Amino acid sequence: MPACVLAYSGGLDTSVILGWLQDEGWDVHCVYVDIGQPGEDKQAILKKAQDCGAKSARIVDVTEELCRDFAFPVLKAGAKYESIYLLGTSIARPLISKVMLQVAREVGATAYAHGATGKGNDQCRFQLAAEALDPTVQMIAPWRIKAFRDRFPGRTELIAYCEEKGIPVKATSAKPYSSDENCLHVSYEAGDLEDLSVAGVDVVDFTMGVSPQEAPDKLEEVTVGFEKGVPVSINGQKLDAKDLVEKANELAGRNGVGRIDMVENRFVGMKSRGVYEAPGMTLLYEAHRMLEELTLDRDLMHLRDQLSPIVAEMVYYGLWYTPKLDALFAFTDKAQEPVTGEVTLGMYKGNLSARRRSSPNSLYDAEIASMEGGGSYDQDDATGFLRITGLPSRVQGTVTPRSY
């Protein structure tokens, strides 16, 4: 029998897909990619796959790699999709595909199956990553196969199939939305959130922190240390990437930081509404930007700001393993060399504010910037500077005067 690997979560969809693949004549190797999903009994999920006839089942923990090699490079680039979304799900998908192909090579599988729908972004991220890493891989996306959709048009048919096959599932009523979790964030979409008249923060049961209204009525300070643009410490304690993100989640979450509600443009062309919470990454992004204000040259910072949306778009679309993104990350690595130092922020009811910042590479010179008399800046120099800068405008104004 041919073999395939299945990105397996143990939920209703992938449980059905496991059974369906077996019905179609595949030996299925289930892979639960651990990217820091909280509150799940991973061993129970593994046992369920084995009990349902999987040829093999395993858990692969890549949480540290997700933070260190995927989230932090995107953070260094200052990339936010459409200026808001911190890309928590987008970042994880190419790593999941990498793991799936590594397992496929180990077990001799020729195909890779996943449960993403034909409407969303995840199908793009899974497949584009897989094809870049192994162009020979056969992708199986059941929700893009008409015969599968005809057989399982809705949740009722999925549950009935599980009952017929003896597959244990929680056959409860559907949640008013769907969610996707990892250590970087939680995303919420679909269900009641498709109605734009509904306030997303009122519908969603957030899990990573309290609401701003419930946060302490007292400002809490936190200090984040960076080396070459990479966060390395919190409150003076050096931490590995995973532990640092978890600590940032804890501190920012209890202060109501990091909730957004947005309508975004999906890669496939439609607009969709998403609610996100990313307390720790919101804190790290803000601290990183504050340190860049001290350490990056003006023109370099402005160029980086022009490139950040390009990085965000490529990550969102799933174009991780591409020469273009490799080159953009290489630029970022060079640009971030001076971004070393510490930033202290104040957290208060969902807000972040600068308290203190320092860097051995600071370009801020109080004597030059001072509004007081004296200092090392000669204001007379500005006259010549402005005469030269204004020359093209004076010539243009003589030739084609503007009305005013």
Regions found by a protein language model. Give the residues of each.
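Nucleotide-activated chemistry modules centered on ATP-dependent adenylation/adenylyltransferase
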Residues: M1-A7, L12-Y404
